[in-house]
A protein has these predicted regions:
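Transmembrane catalytic cores of multi-pass membrane glycosyltransferases
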Residues: 63, 75, 80, 207-307
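Transmembrane-helix signature of polytopic, membrane-embedded enzymes
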Residues: 45, 132-155
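Start-transfer (signal-anchor) and selected internal transmembrane alpha helices
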Residues: 1-52
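Membrane-interface transmembrane helices that cradle and orient dolichyl/undecaprenyl
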Residues: 176-191, 293-297
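Membrane-interface alpha helices of multi-pass inner-membrane proteins
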Residues: 50-51, 153-157, 191-207, 240-245, ...
């Protein structure tokens, strides 16, 4: 209804047209991801159920028992500095960079047994996957594409499912990535600084913290260059992120550990996972289908100006 000098004039705008004008604002943050992402939520649920029902026993591997043993050493004797558990390595320097992961797994086993360790592993894997999918959705990826890429990632990385020290870092990696992606799109804010305490915890769980620290430093430098002025927030990210790697009880001595693992890995000649990543038959199994699918999606569709001709008969030499 509208009021004029002549009186009240009824609003004759069609109901359908008025309904089209009112567009609901999309929900943001975690709520928006949960409300509009049925496919990623389905994937996370399926992975969790699959791990608990079908792959539960397979999640306990040799590294799991190593974590339990190392965690017991931390509880009984404090942080190790010299190797005393094996004959071949007796007397060698032992920098237990993953001491916190070992302690958490040992404490879980001491409280509720090996089944609780399996449940903890499932929670870590599913939590990391959920955060990664949430980061993709928050960055603008569609629900279906997030589901498909997440499914391919799950098929490509079952080696990361067992209870190992790296499993404890999965939620931290995904959470740090989410914060960095948000800062890259909207600019660094105060909540971006949550990356720093996450890196400190990560530095005591697994050596992959170098990846998170490197990405954080790159973002800080990028924000400084883009702003063309010294802003304390991106400067803090660029300077403090590398220092978070040293925030362990071992302090500066942990540098020698990373040098050994990254430059001169002792098992690189016999274990593939210790080698540098390179294209090969193993790495091409899953990326190849996804790459072909991406190429098809990017290929422009052209309208045919003439009808499709009948296929030519196959040569006799090819039919043999």
């Amino acid at each position: 209804m509208s009021t004029t000098a002549a009186g009240t004039v009824p609003d004759v705008t069609p109901t359908r047209e008025r309904a089209d004008v009112r567009v609901a604002a999309p929900a943001g943050g975690l709520r928006g991801v949960l409300e509009s992402s049925p496919f990623p939520i389905l994937l996370v649920s399926l992975v969790g159920i699959l791990l608990l029902t079908a792959f539960g026993p397979a999640l306990v591997v040799g590294d799991t028992w190593l974590m339990l043993m190392a965690g017991r050493e931390v509880v009984d004797h404090g942080l190790p500095e010299t190797e005393t558990l094996t004959v071949l390595g007796s007397g060698a320097t032992w920098t237990d960079q993953q001491w916190l992961a070992h302690l958490v797994v040992y404490g879980t086993h001491a409280l509720a047994g090996i089944r609780a360790v399996v449940v903890l592993d499932v929670l870590l894997v599913v939590g990391g996957l959920a955060l990664a999918l949430g980061a993709a959705r928050a960055a603008g990826a569609t629900s279906r594409s997030t589901f498909l890429v997440g499914l391919l990632a799950g098929l490509a990385g079952p080696g990361g499912w067992p209870m190992r020290a790296q499993a404890t870092a999965l939620p931290l990696f995904a959470g740090v990535l989410w914060l960095l992606l948000d800062a890259a799109r909207r600019g660094a804010r105060r909540r971006t600084l949550l990356v720093l305490p996450a890196l400190v915890v990560w530095a005591n769980l697994h050596g992959s913290v170098l990846l998170g620290a490197s990405l954080t430093t790159v973002l800080g430098v990028y924000e400084l260059v883009r702003a063309r002025r010294l802003d304390w927030l991106p400067l803090s990210l660029a300077v403090l992120a590398p220092l978070c790697v040293l925030a362990t009880p071992y302090g500066w001595d942990v540098v020698a550990y990373y040098e050994l693992m990254l430059v001169d890995a002792p098992f690189a000649e016999i274990l593939r996972e210790w080698q540098w990543s390179s294209p090969g038959g193993t790495t091409a199994r899953v990326p190849s289908p996804s790459a072909r699918a991406g190429a098809r999606a990017r290929r422009p569709r052209r309208r045919r100006s003439r009808p499709r001709s009948a296929p030519s008969p196959e040569p006799a030499s090819r039919r043999r």
